[in-house]
Amino acid sequence: MAETERLMPNGGSRETKPLITGHLILGTIVACLGSIQYGYHIAELNAPQEFLSCSRFEAPDENISYDDTWVGQHGLKQCIALTDSQYGAITSIFSIGGLFGSYYAGNWANRYGRKYVSMGASAMCMVSSLLLFFSNSYLQLLFGRFLVGMSCGTAIVITPLFINEIAPVEWRGAMGSMNQVSINLGILLTQTLALKYADSYNWRWLLFSGSVIAVANILAWLKVDESPRWLVSHGFVSEAETALFKLRPGTYQQAKQEIQDWQRSHGHNRDPESSEETHSGPTLWQYVTDPSYKKPRTVILAILSCQQFCGINSIIFYGVKVIGKILPDYSIQVNFAISILNVVVTLAASAIIDHVGRRPLLLASTTVMTAMSLLISVGLTLSVSFLLVTATFVYIAAFAIGLGPIPFLIIGELSYPQDAATAQSFGTVCNWLATFIVGYLFPIGHGLMGGYVFAIFAAIAAMFATYVYKRVPETKGKTTYSEVWAGY
């Protein structure tokens, strides 16, 4: 592939920021409901672990028998006896399902459109949430978590892709970071509901709530148009012009001109009868094996994998259990506070990401995470609760300002527009593999090494900071592939 000068997604003037329209806000919010589902389900097993697995009994009302509750009356067990390894498998198989969903999501999105693939993912999320709610065995929980992982794996590809395609370049960083904000909102929602439902009678309602979010997302998509970039790439030019006109503050003629600029930048002017395969981008296998994709592929692999290998999901998956060893009476409350902090700092990052840039935030984020991982290790090893909680809060804040929002945002910015869906799938698959490895191995490593396991995360974060400094280009405000990769 010749690295010719082509416009990146939403290329345009960088002089002033255009106004944000109501349809742009609506489209971003609806797309982000998919990320909220991802965040919700990735953390839903954190708080109720001991109650679900029969390790702890806590009745919300001593005067009411479990058999008198709705779930008890309908034959649902009070708990499902699980070993730590079985619970680890249920937690981590979410990542395997997510890997499958992400693997196919790019091709599905290219073929059927961003909107309808996202709606299908939400439908699967609704069904799998209900399956988890009604589960009475280890195998049922495994199957439900695999399915919900598939749906979330699809959603986490579509959300940043759709936002990147509808946002003006001047707002790309701020709006793209809403993906991570939404993931954190999903995690916060789980922790909020856990304050009420994390007990021996009500833990199933935490699993049921995911279906409510899924139904809301399906209905909300009915109010949003398909991505204009997908429409124009498949020959639906008039529909693309109408959709873009709603997203932009200017006139219909200006929207039409932007569509024509897109077509010229890609060297085609398609009609509806054209083969949709011609400009659908590479397959995932082509992307992985073709040497012409080596530069963006390598950086995407490093960023999306190290986001997990720096240890964030050791807190998201197992934070209640880890902190509970030192603060058993306050572990759920501490995790709730962590979730609030994650949302607040990510929102703050979204306000500065287009001013500061991607590289400085990634460097600051990983450097602080390195130091805090070491302090978490010390706090756990020496049972110093104040040090553990403080270091954990700073660690989460550091993640939220850089390594949280930037990886999924930067994939599209590092890629040609026609490669973006496949690159998004590739990066997300890498992220899922890393998530599975951390989710499965962390409880084993923590059992063998105790707090010293966080020293491993510190070493990885330090190496990744060095890699960012040497290999990751800045993408802030850049509109062409060659401009992004100049000097690399």
From Swiss-Prot:
Disulfide bond annotation, renumbered to this chain: none
Q: Which Gene3D superfamilies match?
A: MFS general substrate transporter like domains
PROSITE patterns in the record: MFS, SUGAR_TRANSPORT_1, SUGAR_TRANSPORT_2
The cellular location(s) given in this protein's UniProt record come to:
Vacuole membrane
Membrane side Vacuolar: which residues?
40-87, 143-146, 199-204, 321-322, 365-390, 443-446
> Keywords of this protein's UniProt record, alphabetized?
Glycoprotein, Membrane, Repeat, Transmembrane, Transmembrane helix, Transport, Vacuole
Task: Give the Cytoplasmic compartment stretches of this protein.
Answer: 1-18, 109-121, 168-178, 226-299, 338-344, 412-419, 464-488
Instruction: Supply the name of the protein.
Output: Probable metabolite transport protein YBR241C
Report the source organism: Saccharomyces cerevisiae (strain ATCC 204508 / S288c)
